[in-house]
Design a protein with these regions (language model features):
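Domain-level recognition of nuclease-like catalytic cores that cleave nucleotide substrates
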Residues: 216-286
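Intrinsically disordered, low-complexity Ser/Thr/Pro/Gly-rich regulatory segments
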Residues: 151, 201, 284-285
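Catalytic cores of nucleic-acid endonucleases
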Residues: 181-235
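Active-site beta-strand-loop-beta-strand hairpin of nuclease catalytic cores
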Residues: 168-178
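Short, flexible loop/turn elements at secondary-structure junctions
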Residues: 154, 171-173, 183-186
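Interdomain/boundary linker segments immediately adjacent to catalytic/signaling cores
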Residues: 1-138, 143-144
Length: 286
């Protein structure tokens, strides 16, 4: 077993884009997670002051800095949780796993690697985001049983060209296609998700592509005050859903408090923890 998360990550980078569905990706993802958790186990933790209702956060302490915020109620530090989930995923059989447990396992997988990078690499914002893309992209591909594409053909009178996209999964004739943006967080950039969905609807027809973004969290840490907040734009989201395009689901690993409330108002946005995906797949594609 590798003790170097970044070494396993480097191997993952080399093969991922060629075959997102490949089972070896999950093996390498597991190596990244186990090595990160092993390193973090020996790190001190500091409690952060949470300004988010009913949530508590801590950070891992490195030699010169501390990591991003970690949700105490979601974090699982035993790597066996990932190993057990990986076995279930290989069979696409999730008996014995609750929605909450799957969400916690995947949250812990993502946040552990991100925290490792936070305290060991200076100013590296790209690696955590790319790893999260690999993690969610592979899980989605395996659950759906198909590899994604990142370009789609666009035909018009004057030319034939392709449209660059987030991951798009085509399940075959007369079945829906999934449009999968993957983000560590969204902030004000979230309008890009709705805009991209609008383009897909305009080119291919409304309802052909199911917009299902997956997002890690919306937390922001004030390192000086050691405070955690969630940065959310619920009113803007409602406007985007009414006037730009319709997203089928918005999945989070750490569901923001104000976005969770959007399930209860008009226009309803289906904001759910990511564990739901593994149990509602059939209803989404039916």
């Amino acid at each position: 077993m590798s003790n170097d998360p970044l070494g396993s990550y480097s191997k993952l980078q080399k093969g991922f884009s060629k075959d997102v569905l490949n089972e070896n990706n999950r093996i390498l993802i597991g190596e990244c997670i186990r090595a990160a958790l092993k390193d973090l186990k020996n790190k001190d933790r500091i409690d952060l002051r949470s300004l988010v209702p009913q949530k508590a956060y801590f950070a891992f302490l490195g030699k010169k800095k501390f990591s991003r915020a970690v949700n105490k109620s979601l974090f699982l530090e035993n790597p066996k949780e990932w190993d057990d989930f990986s076995v279930a995923l290989a069979k696409n059989q999730f008996q014995g796993f609750s929605i909450e447990r799957i969400t916690r396992i995947i949250y812990s997988a993502a946040i552990s690697f991100c925290c490792y990078v936070d305290i060991h690499k200076e100013g590296d914002q790209k690696t955590p985001g790319t790893f999260f893309e690999y993690l969610i992209g592979h899980l989605f591909a395996w659950r759906l049983g198909v590899n994604p594409t990142t370009r789609l053909p666009v035909l018009n009178i004057d030319m034939e060209t392709t449209l660059p996209t987030d991951f798009v999964f085509n399940l075959g004739k007369d079945k829906p296609k999934f449009h999968l943006p993957i983000k560590i967080s969204t902030r004000e950039r979230v309008i890009q998700v709705w805009a991209h969905q609008r383009v897909l609807d305009g080119v291919y027809g409304t309802g052909r592509f199911l917009g299902t973004p997956v997002i890690l969290t919306e937390t922001k840490t004030d390192k000086r005050k050691r405070e955690v907040i969630e940065i959310c734009l619920p009113d803007q989201w409602r406007i985007y859903q009414m006037h730009i395009a319709q997203l089928k689901r918005i999945y989070y690993l750490d569901v923001p408090v104000s976005y969770d409330k959007l399930n209860l108002v008009f226009p309803r946005l289906n904001v759910k923890s990511f564990g739901h995906f593994f149990f509602e797949f059939d209803s989404l594609t039916g």
